[in-house]
Curated annotation (Swiss-Prot):
GO terms for cellular component: cytoplasm; nuclear pore central transport channel. Coiled coil: none annotated. This is Nuclear transport factor 2. The keyword Transcription does not apply. It comes from Yarrowia lipolytica (strain CLIB 122 / E 150). Residues 8-121 form the NTF2 domain. GO terms for molecular function: nuclear import signal receptor activity; small GTPase binding. The gene is NTF2. Keywords: Cytoplasm, Protein transport, Transport. One of its GO terms (biological process) is protein import into nucleus. Facilitates protein transport into the nucleus. Could be part of a multicomponent system of cytosolic factors that assemble at the pore complex during nuclear import. It is found in: Cytoplasm. The keyword Cell membrane does not apply.
Amino acid sequence: MSVDFNTLAKQFCEFYYQTFDTDRSQLGNLYRDHSMLTFTGTQHQGAQAIVEKLVGLPFGQVRHKISDIDAQPASAQGGDVIVLVTGELCVDGDNPLPYAQVFHLIPDGSSYYVFNDIFRLNA
């Protein structure tokens, strides 16, 4: 499978953060039962547990401002991609907080799912 990782990473991040910022409950289709989220040091496994964590975050209005997106192939066999995102997280109108997030994207037919998702505030 030939992948333009930079285009894939950009399109994925635009979709992910737009969905996160408007309705986090709709992110479940991006994960599988074996997917894992590490959110500021706490691990959550499976699509349902991940969405429960994201929906349960203690803020209302949120906006991600992406600074940089870097992508690389994750294996020589092809298809999967590692994505590193850095930016600022604006929550409920407070001062922006710097963050980093890593996604490991795995091909699934004509689309991709998130196998690993690691989020860390850099404050």
